[in-house]
């Protein structure tokens, strides 16, 4: 179906707004994936706070101009599915990576975070805010317990030397 100028401008504006508010973006090619599988992906994307859209490459190039995702322009070849993550930078990378494992024809073309092209593996392994805090607290707790044990051992040794 041919798009008129107003429709094209609306698509560019919509994608541009999504890009400006997003933490990260992933580009993929979904040729050969069944409609049923794509519907499942879209549903799980919505639940994860990920905005997904299939957009013509020329419109996508215009939409990302002046955003952090301008670096992805070289990946806009063939059918392009773009996903913006609004809540966690690794959310859509994790989602796409899992989907690509189950669907051989789904190909991840690229990803961007903070204006730079990133490896999808890097983004997929980023911890969520809660996971990062839990890791930090675990490290601090472990360090404090170890330091306390060493302090008691040093105190015990000092008392034994004095006796």
UniProtKB/Swiss-Prot annotation:
Single Gene Ontology BP term?
A: translation
Alphabetized, the UniProt keywords read:
Ribonucleoprotein, Ribosomal protein, RNA-binding, rRNA-binding
Q: Which Pfam families match?
A: Ribosomal_L10
Q: Which GO terms describe its cellular component?
A: cytosolic large ribosomal subunit
Q: What Gene3D superfamilies does the database record attribute to this sequence?
A: 3.30.70.1730, 6.10.250.2350
Q: Name one GO molecular function term.
A: structural constituent of ribosome
Q: What does this protein do?
A: Forms part of the ribosomal stalk, playing a central role in the interaction of the ribosome with GTP-bound translation factors.
* Subunit structure of this chain's protein: Part of the ribosomal stalk of the 50S ribosomal subunit. The N-terminus interacts with L11 and the large rRNA to form the base of the stalk. The C-terminus forms an elongated spine to which L12 dimers bind in a sequential fashion forming a multimeric L10(L12)X complex.
Spell out the family assignment given in the record's similarity comment: Belongs to the universal ribosomal protein uL10 family.
Protein name listed in UniProt: Large ribosomal subunit protein uL10
Organism name = Haemophilus influenzae (strain ATCC 51907 / DSM 11121 / KW20 / Rd)
Task: Tell me the gene name.
Answer: rplJ
């Amino acid at each position: 179906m041919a798009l008129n100028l107003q429709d094209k401008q609306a698509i560019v504006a919509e994608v541009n707004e999504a890009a400006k508010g997003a933490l990260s973006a992933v580009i993929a090619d979904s040729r050969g994936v069944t409609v049923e599988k794509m519907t499942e992906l879209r549903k799980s994307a919505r639940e994860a706070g990920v905005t997904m859209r299939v957009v013509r490459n020329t419109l996508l190039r215009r939409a990302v101009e002046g955003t952090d995702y301008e670096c992805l322009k070289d990946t806009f070849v063939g059918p392009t599915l773009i996903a913006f993550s609004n809540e966690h930078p690794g959310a859509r990378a994790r989602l796409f990576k899992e989907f690509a494992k189950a669907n051989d024809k789904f190909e991840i073309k690229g990803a961007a975070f903070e204006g730079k092209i990133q490896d999808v593996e890097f983004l997929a392994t980023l911890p969520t805010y809660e996971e990062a805090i839990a890791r930090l607290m675990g490290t601090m707790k472990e360090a404090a317990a170890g330091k306390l044990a060493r302090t008691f051992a040093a105190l015990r040794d000092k008392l034994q030397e004095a006796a």
